[in-house]
Amino acid sequence: MVGYILDDDLQEVDAEVFNCISGELNRQNSGLQLIASENFVSKAVLQAQGSIFTNKYAEGYPGKRYYCGCHFADIVENLAIERLCRLFGCKFANVQPHSGSQANQGVFAALLKPGDTVIGMSLDCGGHLTHGSAPSISGKWFNAVQYQVDRDTGLIDMDEIEKLAVEHNPSLIIAGSSSYPRVIDFKRFREIADKVGAYLLADIAHYAGLIAAGEFPSPVEYAHVITSTTHKTLRGPRGAVIMTNYEDIHKKIQSSIFPGMQGGPLMHVIAAKAVAFAEALKPEFKDYAKQIIKNSKALGEVFKERGLDLVTGGTDSHMVVLDLRSKSVTGKDAVLALEKLGIICNKNAIPFDPEKPFVTSGLRFGSAAETSRGLQESEFREIGSMVCDVIDSLKASDSVRLSVERDIIKRVKELTSNFI
């Protein structure tokens, strides 16, 4: 019988993959997930992403598909577009990009030609690979000029960016980051872009949920084009979007994504995006975003109380970035020690980091995922205390370190067992 396998459960068909999924579920539930680019999606988002839209190929856009049978695909994609525009107050949107990197590349393809000058934040100061970093296509195909932060404060130096813009005459300026925890002055970025005749791209991948909830400055009034992932603080499936208020730019982006960058869109992911956008439009999401920031601030306060240095001295978002140099500990050593005990974060470069990228002098923490789980300030203060205990133990004797490890394992288990 040809369809013999189609009705069987995963555990029967592929026990190895089933066991991997079961193991990952246990890992997520039993540990503290503090990677700033991660979150826990709702059951409804999971159901949409695991739906039969997986089966549907729908090259093109609603009303202009290259395949028949796209009636419901058109409806769900239009829902995603309408909800996204309502969420951010923009006029046009493309919900098809598979990732944030592809969204940024789609903007480059729409607005730039090879060799054009692009100004973006340097990787070690908090920028993203796609903001002109040398290993990325953005650094290979374009003349990438990187701005840094102030050495003393760790804050973006807008005067430096203006000087670079006047000197290099860019075609595109990128505002956004992957590890900059402070607010961004999108208005000043636009003023600089206008001064030199450049487009302004706001990459809000990390801040999107906070912006949607009104807890972080919005670039919609200022940016020519906005890109974002749909996971992270927006708490949707892994994917991306592109938004703009300019119809001419929107038309170019439509062509650059399809047929320029991608073929058939992932309709099951677009369905999940639509669900996530609907969730973000609810009043409860504003409360969630407020709690994200309260929790990250509580975490940062504990770090400072325990003598750790924070990049920029604090946070305005879901991110806290630690500078470990005063402890003579590397990010690599710290992150491995924490992971072993169920505290999951990532090693991270700090501004002007003397260490190599796979070693680093910093750690990055995010509060979005555990806030989704229900943790509040008191729990994040406890997390901060545990992190500090582990970092301090790395330079202690073996007996002290082992005692700390046993204590942290117990405390992590007690904390997570209350929020499964």
UniProtKB/Swiss-Prot annotation:
A Pfam family that the UniProt record links to this protein: SHMT
Single GO molecular function: glycine hydroxymethyltransferase activity
Enzyme's top EC category: transferase
UniProtKB keywords: Amino-acid biosynthesis, Cytoplasm, One-carbon metabolism, Pyridoxal phosphate, Transferase
Pathway field: One-carbon metabolism; tetrahydrofolate interconversion; Amino-acid biosynthesis; glycine biosynthesis; glycine from L-serine: step 1/1
Cellular component terms per the entry's GO annotation: cytosol
Catalysis: reaction(s): (6R)-5,10-methylene-5,6,7,8-tetrahydrofolate + glycine + H2O = (6S)-5,6,7,8-tetrahydrofolate + L-serine
GO biological process: glycine biosynthetic process from serine; tetrahydrofolate interconversion
Segments traversing the membrane: none
Residues marked Plays an important role in substrate specificity (site): H231
Cofactor(s) this protein requires: pyridoxal 5'-phosphate
EC number per UniProt: 2.1.2.1
Subcellular location: Cytoplasm
Function description: Catalyzes the reversible interconversion of serine and glycine with tetrahydrofolate (THF) serving as the one-carbon carrier. This reaction serves as the major source of one-carbon groups required for the biosynthesis of purines, thymidylate, methionine, and other important biomolecules. Also exhibits THF-independent aldolase activity toward beta-hydroxyamino acids, producing glycine and aldehydes, via a retro-aldol mechanism.
Family as reported in the entry's similarity comment: Belongs to the SHMT family.
HAMAP family the UniProt entry points to: SHMT
Assembly information from the UniProt record: Homodimer.
Protein name (database record): Serine hydroxymethyltransferase
Native source organism of the sequence: Ehrlichia chaffeensis (strain ATCC CRL-10679 / Arkansas)
Gene: glyA
